[in-house]
């Protein structure tokens, strides 16, 4: 499906902006956007880069913040910041559940379950994906940690493929089922072929309102009914 030209075009959209946020659709130059509704001024987006390269100048990172001492790769750094977003997400849904239960409506308990359902779905999906290695999320902790045969593991102790899948699904979870555009650059890197095949469906399970724009060299990523959504780079470049 190609990569280089698509990513270059994508960079026109997100150049100079931090990953994850909003940008004004009417201020972009050289990129034509079609938005819905037509008068939309802002677009929420996330960008996921999948390569697990060593952190540049690791000593400087550790001196900057001692809590970063466990981080060795770019995926570790992404997970560190996603953990912070995950804590905020849990506070947010907790406050919504409390407000719902205090409202006194007869369906308050069902609504509270609906609010908390995406988090449980995320945990169930991760447990299923990691089941072959016996890892399960510890659901009593606020930060994401895993249990494996009685040992507690941090996300930074996962394999590259496990970290990558966790980054993707955690990014989608904290979008809180809001409309987002999710850019992904070769998400199949380090992922087992079965995970590649399930990836898009897993993302849409957590956020049905996300629009996915990705580049890939793997047929498995689009094998599950997405072949008709593929654009060849050669068809859109000179």
Model-derived segments and spans:
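Extended helical coiled-coil dimerization/tether regions that scaffold
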Residues: 87-157, 173
């Amino acid at each position: 499906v190609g990569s280089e030209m698509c990513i270059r075009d994508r960079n026109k959209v997100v150049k100079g902006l931090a990953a994850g946020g909003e940008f004004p659709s009417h201020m972009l130059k050289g990129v034509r956007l079609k938005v819905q509704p037509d008068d939309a001024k802002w677009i929420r987006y996330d960008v996921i880069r999948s390569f697990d390269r060593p952190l540049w100048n690791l000593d400087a990172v550790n001196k900057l913040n001692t809590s970063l001492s466990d981080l060795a790769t770019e995926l570790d750094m992404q997970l560190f910041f996603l953990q912070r977003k995950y804590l905020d997400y849990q506070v947010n849904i907790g406050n919504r559940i409390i407000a719902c239960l205090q409202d006194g409506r007869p369906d308050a308990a069902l609504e509270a379950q609906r609010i908390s359902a995406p988090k449980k779905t995320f945990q169930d999906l991760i447990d299923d994906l990691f089941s072959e290695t016996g890892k399960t999320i510890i659901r009593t902790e606020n930060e994401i940690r895993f249990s494996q045969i009685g040992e507690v593991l941090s996300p930074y102790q996962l394999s590259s493929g496990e970290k990558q899948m966790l980054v993707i699904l955690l990014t989608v979870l904290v979008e809180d089922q809001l409309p987002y555009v999710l850019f992904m650059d070769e998400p199949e890197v380090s992922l087992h072929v079965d995970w590649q095949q399930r990836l898009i469906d897993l993302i849409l399970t957590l956020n049905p309102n996300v629009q996915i724009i990705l580049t890939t060299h793997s047929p498995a990523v689009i094998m599950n009914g997405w072949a008709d959504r593929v654009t060849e780079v050669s068809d859109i470049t000179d």
